[in-house]
Amino acid sequence: MAHPHLLAERISRLSSALEKGLYERSHAIRLCLLAALSGESVFLLGPPGIAKSLIARRLKFAFQRARAFEYLMTRFSTPEEVFGPLSIQALKDEGRYERLTTGYLPEAEIVFLDEIWKAGPAILNTLLTAINERHFRNGAFEEKIPMRLLVAASNELPEADSSLEALYDRMLIRLWLDKVQDKANFRSMLISQQDESDNPVPASLQVSDEEYQQWQKDIGAISLPDPVFELIFTLRQQLDNLPNAPYVSDRRWKKAIRLLQASAFFSGRDAVAPIDLILLKDCLWYDAQSLNLMQQQLEILMTGHAWQQQAMLTRLGGIVQRRLQLQQQQSDKTAFTVIKEGGMFSRRPHYTLPPEASASTLTLLLQKPLKLHDMEVIHITFDRSALELWLTKGGEIRGKLNGIGFAQTLNMEVDNAQHLVVRDISLQGTRLALPGTAEDSMPAEIKQQLETLENDWRQQHTRFSEQQHCLFIHSDWLGRIEASLQDVGEQIRQAKQC
């Protein structure tokens, strides 16, 4: 088997070749290629004339010697037009009921059925068996069919509670397509002279029969790690609890997981990663309402849980709360405390300085820096006599901010715990402390917890960076996930700086 990274590069180049000349259909081509490489079915929903049939025809060129069959269903379509006519010779000579299948669906690797919901019951029943079991009953014999990809298309969804639901459930990937939107792409499409029947894929990129068969075994060997399973189960529970969520059968979940395994395999990985789960948005919807719902639920999962974003924010909230508790305890211990004086009948309490504040000039540290008089202040120098007078009689108090310049007026008070508190213009306050008693505002316990959390964040970001090279995921999703991780990282960095 080729080296995983070489295989991923080859599949990427194969997809690029298939996409040539198709405008705004890259994502559809890539998912149809993934379906073809893993033996699944695709439903394309969209108005006529938007290259649905061309997508299916292109996929034939992904394989060496692949045969294609396409048919436009009508209400009058017969099984003979899809599965082949009856052999008159066999019926006449041997009395055998046998179809001549050469050139029809039973012998094609790539099948495209347009206006699929117009098919009658006889076609639908045979088609269900072909999709489920990859077998076709031809008279008295069961014949194995080589179908690797079935692309069904329509401009409408099947009616609810109709006989078509069983077939619709077999369409694992469901893509809602629209007209070309971008102006430049529309112009390029109009003037393109490319022959749609030309093979755009170099022979060196085409998949051989042996490779295809081996890859089916290799896909099954891709592991589903426990954390990824937990994300899938969380999504399943969310859908079960939402009133308007689509019903998703166990069979559909199982087939979807195999698609995720294929995504991991063709991305060069040996295990399903959270990034692969984005593919579920194209597997689990039923109609327009459930399509939007799936987008919302996958976005919540990818930007909140897949790389532990919400869990890390919850941990950060707990660390910040603990830091506030420790800082409050430390603040009570180190704050500069004055002595309350005065009798019980005094109109106003007055205070005196403690014995350790005996110098003629006192420098007190702010336990938290404040912006005072347009200056970032970390300590204030007071004249001892002026401070004593203010403690005794009140009035105006001045101090030199950071010990420089002229003394500036201060908004200062004594709190209930007899600590000096200075406030800024927005009335945010901090206690004052003597030099040598104010300790680091960030306790060692908190520093360690923040370091551990930041390391965990780096690991998650590295995991995402290693996993994001997935051909089958649109780049818009990668941008949203990256933004969610960067937001968590920024909040951690801000907490470390406080």
From Swiss-Prot:
CDD domains: AAA. One of its GO terms (molecular function) is ATP binding. It catalyses: ATP + H2O = ADP + phosphate + H(+). It is found in: Cytoplasm. The keyword ATP-binding applies. Its EC number is 3.6.1.-. It comes from the Bacteria. ADP binds at Y23, G49, I50, A51, K52, S53, L54, E196. Keywords: ATP-binding, Chaperone, Cytoplasm, Hydrolase, Nucleotide-binding. GO terms for cellular component: cytoplasm. SMART domains: AAA (SM00382). ATPase activity is stimulated by ViaA. It is an enzyme of class 3 (hydrolase). It holds the Pfam family ATPase_RavA_C. Belongs to the RavA family. NCBIfam families: PRK13531.1 (NF010054). Homohexamer. Interacts with ViaA. Component of the RavA-ViaA chaperone complex, which may act on the membrane to optimize the function of some of the respiratory chains. RavA functions as an ATPase. This is Regulatory ATPase RavA.
